């Protein structure tokens, strides 16, 4: 009988299963790590441990991986399935050396020399009993629970107290075939493998637990001694005519107001609560791109998460997902409005640090905040902040606030050694709890001050909220970004470290727009967002079920055959599946009659549903524009479509943070799909197939309100080419209100003054607001915008503009 089959071992494993709850990272090793089930596999672990192997065995059984107790048989050789770099640590004395494990690596490599077809996968596996990073100068607790090198007695205590927080992490496999072919099979290569594995396990531990936490008061005293805060204290004392000790006390107050007080114990408790909460709220959370972020952590990057801001739930969702993806929850920049009892202290111990809405010229506060942020980067803590500054009320991304990005870039300029990388994150929900409140605020109702009662009120309304979505976008490494934007930035800073570079503000603005674009590039399409888009484009927000399903199938085809980006996610299934999900979530209504089912949006929530449509409108706005061209322009050819797309794309790009590199190529690909789907026929020009007119009409409806805005702007500019930006914004907003009143436009963003401000800035950039140079372009684009509108809407715009500016 083998050792692991003995009654003693079976009893220990049974007891461990009762005490231990294990989380696997990543959740699907086959998919995320590209493991090949057809090839032999060997697990590599740092330390030999009965309990670790037992925990691994339980997970491999669930995942369909070979058991660590099952021997490897290749080429007539039998070998253990697990190789450990260190022997188990005895209660007294020294552990065994690693020579036998180097010999084992050598044996595995040698087998590849004998069999050229063989390719054994070496899979590193890390186990963590709890994820406490420890504190700087920690002594007593580290002695009791020495997690990295525990004896069997300490391991028993860890299982007893931390068994419910066990994580098993699989890493990318190393091909021994590749190692043997590229580097040989001798002992030197085996030793190199062992060294690389040790370094890997050490880096992996830092990713999972994070750096050690400083003592809060010790951190404050260290920060107060920094040059920048010392200088700010002296300036504060001189300007306010107070003593330096009083100014220092004020700086200490600011630090206490700002700084997080991260508690691993609270995070463990919060993890249990949040697991209950997500299971109560959502049927699942869909995650895309976590592996690339884990790799950035592993490669030593300082990670700054920059998510979009939909809901107060964002604070909890991203931290929860990162925790379960084997990464440390970040320190989150939270608005000072959330620092109310009891939520504020809880958020602070969960990693939140608080920031005022405005620094208001307070130089001491500014110096304190910047130095604290620098310290987070220097010590290696990941950070999270919302570049929009607040929650979007319309479902579209807001124009970015650049303050935190500027401070992050300044930290890089001041010499943060590790590469600092921004990770844009798209957060989406099938249901946003605050969405009804948002539309009340947009209608003029005053925003309520955050309080604990609001949280209790939200929790009381918990229900079936469908799915949540967390997509990680394309990372931006700031050193590389600076090299591209300002190749001489290092020399410029070295010449005068205290002088703000003239290029800094435009570079920060470019960075902010790139962040927002990368967030939108990672959008998640869902049943709610896509059905909202289709139904809101119909006349009465209602369609026959068969027609709705057919339209959804068309949109799914467009999104899958020509993906917006590699970071975008599109749901599996068919239009029928999406409609069923929408009905289940009670976002849609169904009425039946002898002719079939009718699916609609209740008029009372139609405005609310624009929020969900707006989450992904940028994904379908160009296909919608193309459909409008095909329907409304006579004898429309490819060149006509591409020319119209190129005219409007710069405005769409500015308004919707779009990142299509080649709009002409994209338009051609969409046209090819429409031809392949039988909606249009192409000869010298496009002919719309009669049976497909309704599908193209629905598709074109998505851009109708956007095109109305552009028609307002260009009709105004043609009548008065030299308009000032402020006048253009005011007049266009007034015309939008008139148009909405006459034609029943209810989408909140249609009346958003900030949106017209964004468009006016872009028009100025494009040269349409300077002298008469752009007059011919303005006339052409005005005619094209008018062409793509319904005749009644076009007439209202033309008449209103002439009545105001010509009469």
Swiss-Prot record:
GO CC aspect terms: plasma membrane
Q: Which gene encodes it?
A: plsB
| Family annotation (HAMAP family) | Glyc3P_acyltrans
Q: What is its EC number?
A: 2.3.1.15
Q: What is this protein called?
A: Glycerol-3-phosphate acyltransferase
Topological category with respect to the lipid bilayer: Peripheral membrane protein
Return the domain comment text from this UniProt entry. Answer: The HXXXXD motif is essential for acyltransferase activity and may constitute the binding site for the phosphate moiety of the glycerol-3-phosphate.
Q: Which GO terms describe its molecular function?
A: glycerol-3-phosphate O-acyltransferase activity
Q: Would you kindly state one Gene Ontology biological process term found in this protein's UniProt entry? A: CDP-diacylglycerol biosynthetic process
Supply the alphabetized keyword list. Acyltransferase, Cell inner membrane, Cell membrane, Lipid biosynthesis, Lipid metabolism, Membrane, Phospholipid biosynthesis, Phospholipid metabolism, Transferase
């Amino acid at each position: 009988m083998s050792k692991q089959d003995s009654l003693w071992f079976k009893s220990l494993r049974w007891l461990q299963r009762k005490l231990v709850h294990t989380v696997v990272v990543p959740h699907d090793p086959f998919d995320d790590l590209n493991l090949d089930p057809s090839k032999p596999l060997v697990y590599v672990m740092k330390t030999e441990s009965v309990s670790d192997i037992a925990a691994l065995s339980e997970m491999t059984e669930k995942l369909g991986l070979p058991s660590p107790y099952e021997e490897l048989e290749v080429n007539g050789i039998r070998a253990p399935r697990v190789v450990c770099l260190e022997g188990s640590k005895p209660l007294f004395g020294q552990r065994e050396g690693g020579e036998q494990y180097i010999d084992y690596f050598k044996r595995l490599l040698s087998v590849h020399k004998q069999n050229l077809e063989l390719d054994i996968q070496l899979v590193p596996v890390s186990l963590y009993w709890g994820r406490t990073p420890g504190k700087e100068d920690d002594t007593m607790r580290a002695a009791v629970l020495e997690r990295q090198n525990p004896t069997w007695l300490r391991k028993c205590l860890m299982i007893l107290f931390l068994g419910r927080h066990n994580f098993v992490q699989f890493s990318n496999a190393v091909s021994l075939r590749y190692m043997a072919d590229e580097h040989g099979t001798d002992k030197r290569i085996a030793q190199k493998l062992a060294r690389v594995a040790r370094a890997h396990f050490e880096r992996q531990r830092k990713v999972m637990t994070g750096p050690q936490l400083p003592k809060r008061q010790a951190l404050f005293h260290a920060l107060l001694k920094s040059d920048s805060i010392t200088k700010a204290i002296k300036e504060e004392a001189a300007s306010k005519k107070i003593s330096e000790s009083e100014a220092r006390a004020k700086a200490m107050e600011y630090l206490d107001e700002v700084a997080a007080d991260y508690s691993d114990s609270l995070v463990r408790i919060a993890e249990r609560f949040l697991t209950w909460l997500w299971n109560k709220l959502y049927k699942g959370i869909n995650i895309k791109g976590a592996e690339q972020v884990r790799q950035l952590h592993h490669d030593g990057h300082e990670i700054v998460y920059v998510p979009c801001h939909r809901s107060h739930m964002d604070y909890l969702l991203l931290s929860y997902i990162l925790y379960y993806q084997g990464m440390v929850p970040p320190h989150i920049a939270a608005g000072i409005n959330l620092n109310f009892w009891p939520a504020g202290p809880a958020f602070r111990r969960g990693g939140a640090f608080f920031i005022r809405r405005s620094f208001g010229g307070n130089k001491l506060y500014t110096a304190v905040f910047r130095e604290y942020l620098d310290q987070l980067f220097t010590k290696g803590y990941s950070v999270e902040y919302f570049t929009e500054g607040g929650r979007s009320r319309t479902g579209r991304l807001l124009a970015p606030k650049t303050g935190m990005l500027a401070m992050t870039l300044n930290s890089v300029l001041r010499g943060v050694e590790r590469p600092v990388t921004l990770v844009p994150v798209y957060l989406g929900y099938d249901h946003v709890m605050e969405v009804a409140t948002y539309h009340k605020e947009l209608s003029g109702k005053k925003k309520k001050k955050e309080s604990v009662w609001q949280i209790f009120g939200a929790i009381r309304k918990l229900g079936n909220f469908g799915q949540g979505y967390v997509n990680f976008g394309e990372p931006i490494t700031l050193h590389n970004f600076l090299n591209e934007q300002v190749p001489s930035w290092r020399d410029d800073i070295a010449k005068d470290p205290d002088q703000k570079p003239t290029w800094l503000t435009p570079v920060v603005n470019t960075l902010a727009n790139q962040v927002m674009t990368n967030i939108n590039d990672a959008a998640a399409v869902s049943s709610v967002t896509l059905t909202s888009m289709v139904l809101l484009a119909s006349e009465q927000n209602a369609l026959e079920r068969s027609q709705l399903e057919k339209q959804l199938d068309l949109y799914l085809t467009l999104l899958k055959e020509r993906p917006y980006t590699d970071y975008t996610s599109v749901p599996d299934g068919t239009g029928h599946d999406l409609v069923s999900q929408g009905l289940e979530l009670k976002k849609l209504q169904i009425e039946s009659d002898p002719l079939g089912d009718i699916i609609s949006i209740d008029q009372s929530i139609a405005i609310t549903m624009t929020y969900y449509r707006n989450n992904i409108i940028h994904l379908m706005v160009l296909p919608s524009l193309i459909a409008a061209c095909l329907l409304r322009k006579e004898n429309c050819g490819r060149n006509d479509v591409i020319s119209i797309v190129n005219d409007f794309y710069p405005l769409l790009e500015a308004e919707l943070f779009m990142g299509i590199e080649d709009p002409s190529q994209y338009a051609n690909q969409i046209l090819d799909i429409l031809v392949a789907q039988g909606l249009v026929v192409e000869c010298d020009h496009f002919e719309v197939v009669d049976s497909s007119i309704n599908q193209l009409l629905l598709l074109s409806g998505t851009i109708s309100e956007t095109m109305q805005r552009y028609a307002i702007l260009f009709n105004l500019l043609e009548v008065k080419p030299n308009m000032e930006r402020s006048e253009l914004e005011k007049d266009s907003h007034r015309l939008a209100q008139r148009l909405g009143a006459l034609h029943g436009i209810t989408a909140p963003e249609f009346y958003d003054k900030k949106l017209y401000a964004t468009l006016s800035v872009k028009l100025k950039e494009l040269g349409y607001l300077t002298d008469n140079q752009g007059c011919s372009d303005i006339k052409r684009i005005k005619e094209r915008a008018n062409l793509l509108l319904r005749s009644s809407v076009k007439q209202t715009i033309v008449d209103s503009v002439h009545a105001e500016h010509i009469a």
